[in-house]
Amino acid sequence: MTKEDKEKKEKIEYRPLPAIAVGDLVKVGLLILEGDKERVQTYEGTVISKHRAGLNSTITVRKTFQGVGIERVFCLYSPRMVFVEFIRHSKARRAKLYYLRNRVGKQSRLEERFDLVTNTILLDLLASESDPSNSRT
């Protein structure tokens, strides 16, 4: 293994990412430089494609703003990427959802997917909140 390969492997291990699948609704935070100020710009949309290539892995996120479809490609291991969080899982029968480009309005919606893992995590959270011994006083 070369020195470059070792550095790439360390960078990948350094940034753990959530399990993002095609069809998920995600929120991505990007660091934007405006003059000498920095701010985090959020972008929320549906993942329509995922390209896995180690450090060069990317996701393509699509959203509709004022009736116009906007797609943006994000490099997952970019130093400007602040966070990636998923909001909702959706069912996808394809690896690439490019057919959503031709759909408008309600036609572009995807059916929500309910995972047992997500449901058990939510149930554990609800149980801990309803437990009187864990309440704040």
From Swiss-Prot:
Subcellular locations according to the entry: Plastid, Chloroplast
Main location: plastid
Record's keyword annotation contains Ribosomal protein: yes
GO terms for MF: structural constituent of ribosome
Family annotation (InterPro entries): Ribosomal_bL19 (IPR001857), Ribosomal_bL19_CS (IPR018257), Ribosomal_bL19_sf (IPR038657), Translation_prot_SH3-like_sf (IPR008991)
Protein name: Large ribosomal subunit protein bL19c
GO biological process, one term: translation
Entry keyword set: Chloroplast, Plastid, Ribonucleoprotein, Ribosomal protein
Matches recorded under Pfam families: Ribosomal_L19
Family of this protein: Belongs to the bacterial ribosomal protein bL19 family.
Ranges in coiled-coil conformation: none
Example of a GO cellular component annotation carried by this entry: ribonucleoprotein complex
NCBIfam families: rplS_bact (TIGR01024)
Entry-linked Gene3D superfamilies: 2.30.30.790
